[in-house]
């Protein structure tokens, strides 16, 4: 493996995280009070989680991220619409989310869905006057921003491989 090949993935991840952070920060900043730094953070985390060694692995990771984030955002939004934040309630929402993922035969999405529950519930608790539904939607969109940046970045990056058997 050449030095360029060894540096490609770290560079892809760093650039994707930066671009996703900036876009997420800007986007969430359009909604006063909804914490643009959290929007940037969540977008960057998504880009890091989704970026993989190959295009195929990145695409697969992207589908996990989007569906998992949607399930987690919906579960936490429903909980926070009915009840205020509480750590035990968060654990209950995580349990329900993982159970739902398992019940609909997508257990591989459960971890990312559970992480989304935590992020939505904790950020929502920072200012309970804000709309919990909008907070959950923003966290989902930020996840999509990071995911999109990662997929686009891997597809456009020179030397990115389609799969692990590629030599290009």
Which residues does each predicted region cover?
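Alpha-helical transmembrane segments and their membrane-interface boundaries
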Residues: 1-117, 122-168
